[in-house]
């Protein structure tokens, strides 16, 4: 009698194909039955769903069906039986995070007065087992959701909800956000080929933000260095572009998601005011904010105008109430005598769609304005692949690093930490995991992909050579140990324990 098969469905938004997996052995419940069950001898996970999109497209063309391979016959170092070398598959080093979670769990389990090394080892082993089990459950649930197997997915979600604790270890906390995303995706499952729903007119998820989300975003700005790092690098680049200019103009795409008080531009105004008088002093600064929440943006503009006036800077502030996709060159008034720069902080990924048209149009429109520089800060991770399972694994790895950093900075029961995790990062995670089509706004991409997109739109990279200053900025602002800054092909990348988080880049026409 032939063994039962479980069809794992790989899907993009328009088509599907199946991989038949053997469920007759204990490997059946393992998320990837053609890989060995995880044990301490495996240093890294090689995840087949991290294969490049090109490989997936070849798979679809050939309409391959994967033959079940037992763990005893599978060798990670061998590629003779595979059409794609396993060595070419990007590795997601979840083991590094599991070791970290293991230490957290061990510390939580130990009595305060114990000095027993046996207790330490036992607690660490229990913590590792729990963490590994949670990872396996998440992946198995993601596969069930991808297969539209509501019964199996619901069963796994029930177990996950009892283990993914909002106030647990850092991995339990990030898992709770992914559980929410999987649950939402399960409820939104529709027959293949049906409509994806109506898209709201938004620039980013903050356009429809609740008060809780707005508070969480302010806390993220104050606590995490991601956005402040972007502001520091962007302002330094803008100041360099404005050197020797009397009339300057900044076009801010999204106005930093509507952060109150205009923190980035207060810093720029202060720096401009400190420049020497005479030819080096700016005679007029114009800021054009692009966004849909006109009342919020105008309030920021009023505050900035008062601040600039007190420092002797002539500021003209205006708002263009449009999203980026509908923005036209005539919407932005550009004077011939002024130096123009365009600033984009965590904005352009929201314009990335399944087709290249939307983003290309926006970039070409910006290019047509002939700015001296376009400064861009984006999340440096691949969350825009066409296949759900690939996005799921990439985002799990990325947000695990962020939640690990929060664990290092804040106590377990800190309410500010919980608000950031559940009302900001969870919203990003849910958008990546549960949404498709126009509703999926969080389409983060790696620097190399942005480099190709910018080149197609006519931009040339302008290397940012200030890695030493950026490292000094980390020290000066007493940023938590574990954050790193590296230069990567002219971009500055802020990472957590070498895992890239955000990347800043500069582009010229």
UniProtKB/Swiss-Prot annotation:
Keyword terms, alphabetized: Nucleus, Transcription, Transcription regulation
Region (SAW): 434-508
Domain GRAS: residue ranges: 125-508
GO annotation terms (biological process): arbuscular mycorrhizal association; cellular response to phosphate starvation; detection of phosphate ion; regulation of DNA-templated transcription; response to symbiotic fungus
Annotated GO CC locations: nucleus
KO phenotype (gene knockout): Strongly reduced number of arbuscules undergoing accelerated degeneration during root colonization by arbuscular mycorrhiza (AM) fungi (e.g. Rhizophagus irregularis).
Localization per Swiss-Prot or TrEMBL: Nucleus
Domain of life: Eukaryota
Region named PFYRE: 340-431
InterPro entries reported in the protein's UniProt record: TF_GRAS (IPR005202)
Pfam families, per database record: GRAS
Region (Leucine repeat I (LRI)): 132-198
Disulphide bridges, residue numbers: none
Tissue-level expression: Expressed in roots under low phosphate (Pi) conditions.
Quaternary state and interactors: Interacts with RAM1 and NSP2.
Role played: Transcription factor acting as a regulator of arbuscular mycorrhiza (AM)-related genes (e.g. PT4, STR and RAM2). Required for the morphogenesis of arbuscules upon symbiosis with AM fungi (e.g. Rhizophagus irregularis). Also involved in restricting mycorrhizal colonization of the root meristem.
Family to which this protein belongs: Belongs to the GRAS family.
Protein's name in the database: GRAS family protein RAD1
Species assigned in the record: Lotus japonicus (Lotus corniculatus var. japonicus)
Gene label: RAD1
